[in-house]
């Protein structure tokens, strides 16, 4: 897999990007001609004309990653069609508008992604591989941006990635392998992204996804959708998508797993310090700015769960401090507005109608112990809202509406909440 870019593919991608850019202009009602070089950060983070903008994407968007200056959004996209493009869409952001600049082909099925803190690398989970791309080349259009594909195991199902604050280590959720792979990113960069940079694997259980660091970088929180048999937890959860009236419980709850980051960097197999029951099929996780609470979407419980992080290691049975019923099959979660609110995507991903538009639920973080009373209202979304990204200034939210092939852009300073009974 040494060379994944050909002149034919580049031509196809450029043509494809041009078509999508025209679509974008029609939706955002922009008549301006903008350059493709990054404007000043203040222009990049300017407010849009409307509180919500739906930007069409060239495929199903999975994850938006935003540059530290807010000028660029990198979105992993898949099509499910072997004749179409799977890759990373690059969008420039200026004067409150997004413009699709180019789509870069990636072999496989790109899903979770992250930018290193120096903004130099875009790292993408890609099934059996982790993909490394040069962001400067992507933005300038000069040179091949593909730096390497690193295999972390056959059929591993790499789905999510995150890096430590110092960019020294990379963590990869292997959904099929039931592990978290730890990679020495410094070594990978120096040696051409070879498997020799893999430090080892953390055994976590069925379908791990979330990779969220505590603010001080000491702990990594991940999720296992179904706890391993070795935990000896009771069977409480019904199969997802089954008729809740007739289905019987078949699985134990899933878990939040707490990892000692320093230990994981040298001895991954022995780095787990806590396992906490977290509802049925916990998937994504966000943490409060002060690190005092973590919030997890329990997809098969149709709920957001809140946990006290100080109790997760010492008193895991007492760590749950709130359960908020949200919409159907919640997936994405973000803590916004300085930790005062939580936003959850209600994916409804197992519904028979996969094109129906869904909602986001907005929650008062101070009231999570009150359950449903903590809900402030809803925000309109596309079909299968999946993943949430934020601009570095905390003023803009990016939601990947997977089935409707849209990137939803929300102005958090003008949060367009629809309250119960509001029309």
Predicted region positions:
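Sec-dependent N-terminal signal peptides
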Residues: 9-21
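Predominantly soluble domains enriched in secretory-pathway, periplasmic, or organellar proteins
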Residues: 16, 27-423
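N-terminal secretory signal peptides that target proteins for export/translocation
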Residues: 1-10
């Amino acid at each position: 897999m040494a060379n994944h870019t050909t002149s034919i593919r580049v031509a196809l991608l450029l043509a494809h990007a041009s078509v999508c850019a025209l679509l974008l202009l029609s939706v955002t009602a922009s008549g301006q001609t903008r350059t493709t070089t990054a404007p000043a950060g203040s222009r990049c983070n300017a407010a849009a004309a409307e509180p919500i903008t739906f930007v069409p994407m060239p495929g199903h968007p999975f994850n938006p990653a935003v540059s530290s200056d807010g000028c660029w959004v990198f979105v992993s996209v898949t099509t499910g069609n072997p004749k179409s493009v799977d890759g990373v869409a690059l969008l420039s952001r200026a004067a409150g508008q997004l413009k699709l600049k180019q789509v870069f082909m990636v072999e496989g099925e790109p899903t979770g992604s992250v930018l290193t803190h120096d903004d130099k690398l875009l790292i993408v989970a890609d099934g059996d591989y982790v993909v490394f791309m040069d962001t400067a080349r992507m933005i300038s259009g000069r040179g091949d941006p593909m730096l390497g594909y690193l295999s972390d195991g056959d059929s591993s199902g790499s789905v999510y990635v995150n890096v430590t604050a110092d960019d020294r280590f990379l963590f990869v959720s292997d959904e099929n392998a039931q592990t978290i792979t730890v990679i020495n990113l410094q070594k990978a960069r120096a040696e051409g992204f070879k498997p020799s940079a893999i430090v080892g694997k953390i055994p976590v259980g069925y379908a791990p996804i979330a990779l969220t660091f505590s603010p001080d970088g000491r702990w990594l929180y991940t999720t296992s959708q179904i706890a391993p048999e070795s935990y000896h937890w009771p069977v409480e959860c019904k199969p997802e998508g089954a008729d809740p009236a007739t289905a019987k419980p078949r699985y134990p709850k899933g878990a939040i797993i707490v990892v000692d980051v320093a230990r994981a960097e040298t001895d991954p197999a022995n780095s787990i310090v806590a396992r906490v029951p977290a509802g049925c099929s916990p998937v994504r996780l966000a943490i409060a700015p002060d690190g005092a609470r973590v919030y997890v979407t329990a997809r098969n419980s149709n709920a957001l769960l809140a946990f006290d992080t100080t109790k997760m290691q010492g008193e895991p049975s007492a760590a749950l401090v709130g359960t908020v019923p949200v919409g159907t099959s919640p997936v994405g979660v973000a803590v916004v507005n300085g930790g005062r609110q939580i936003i959850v995507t209600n994916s409804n991903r197992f519904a028979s109608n996969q094109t129906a538009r869904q909602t986001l639920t907005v929650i008062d973080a101070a009231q999570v112990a009150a359950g449903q009373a903590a809900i402030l209202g809803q925000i309109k979304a596309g079909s299968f809202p999946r993943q949430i990204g934020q601009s570095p200034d905390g003023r803009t939210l990016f939601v990947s509406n997977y089935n409707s092939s849209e990137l939803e852009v929300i102005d958090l300073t003008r949060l367009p909440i629809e309250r119960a009974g509001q029309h």
